[in-house]
Every structure is written in C-alpha cells, then in structure tokens.
Amino acid sequence: RGLGDVYKRQLLDAAKGGKLKKLKEVNKREIVEGVTPEYMERRIDLLLDYVKKHSPYYKKHPEWTKLEDFPVMTKGDFLEHYEEVLVENSKEQGNLYRLSTSGSTGTPFTVLCDGDKMNRVNMNFISCMELNGFRLGMKRGEFRAWIKGKNTISMWKSFKNNLIMVDISNMGDDSLEKICKDIEKKKIQVLVTYSSALTALTGYIRRTGRDISKWKVEMVFSMGEALPDATYE
C-alpha cells in the first residue's frame, strides 16, 4: 500500500482503540507460536454451534454434534444449497463483502464476509507478509484472472496501493513473456500468485532460458496448492 494510505489507516485505527493493530499482533503470535489443540477445539465447537442455530441448512440436523458428524461439502454442494447455508442474520451484519475464486478449477465460488471477517482476512495476510520481510511501500504484483468491469482496480488505486494487476486468464507463452516483461519493467518486488500460475511461469523461464537477472523481485507468496519441488529452484 502507499505510505500515505497506510499511515491514514493506522491513525484511524488508533483513534478507534487500535483494533486492527491488536488483531495483527495476535495473528503474528499465532503464526509463530501456534495455537493449542484445546483452543482449536473450542473455536470449532463455537462455530458449529453458531451455524446449527443460525443456518437453515444445518438447523435441519440437530443430530450433528461433533465435527466428524458434518459432511464434507464440495463447492458444488454449497452452490446447490447456497441460500440455505447462509445464516439467517447475514443481512443484519452491515455491509457484506464478496470474495470470489476465478473458477480455474472448473467451479467459480463466492463467499460473503462482514466487516469483521474482512479485517481478520486482511490482517492475517499482512501478518504473514510482514513476518517474511514485507516492508511498507514495496511494489507487489497480484496474479489473478483480472476481468475488466468486474474485479479490476483503477490506475489511481493501483498507484496508491503499489499494486500491479498481473492477469493470468491466459497462460500461453506470449502471455507468460508479457508477465516477465512487466515484472522487469514495472520493478515489481513482491509476487502474490497461485501455485498453478507460478508453476507455469517458472516452467516457461526454465524451458526458454529467459533472462531474469534484471528483476527486482525479493519475495514470492504462493497460494492455493503445494508447489512442485522443481518450482523452488
């Protein structure tokens, strides 16, 4: 993020009691030190109890008492029962935010989050990045299927947040070469990418002998799946 934007957020947070700062500190401690099995079990029990009281889908199954009783649901299962799964008081939780997958595995998926959940998601991500050396002002490239008019951001917001949109809707050689050129030309320092896209990019570099000596990349964050060993090299 731009420094001005970050400082503004920090001042606003401090004025409201430093909630986000405390959340980030808790996240860092949990990432570094871990959490106890008792804590995890207590949190899971609270979550299961909540959905059994507030979700029409889970209300129908009072016999489900332990995590093992709850069925594993695919994205397709959730989509089929989407309105039932949503908790009844979701509309009472203020502004809701939509988090969507690109559908690269065949099934697009969207979840709704309230403001508190979005704060936790963002602080967890920032905590993980900072623990791995991320610094304020670093220019990051976010790899995703950027769709104009749907999830793209303005040039001003891109500049303000030091965020470069790296489109991965096409992963052919021409597109991969363009990604390589953009990383070099725009002096991107942090890559935030899905493992599948990173695997394709590293495969292209290895296969073509593409020169990356002028890249300014210091950090790579991979999401989604485990990376093949060859990708690390």
Q: Model segments located where?
A:
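Glycine-rich His-Gly loop
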Residues: G103, A145
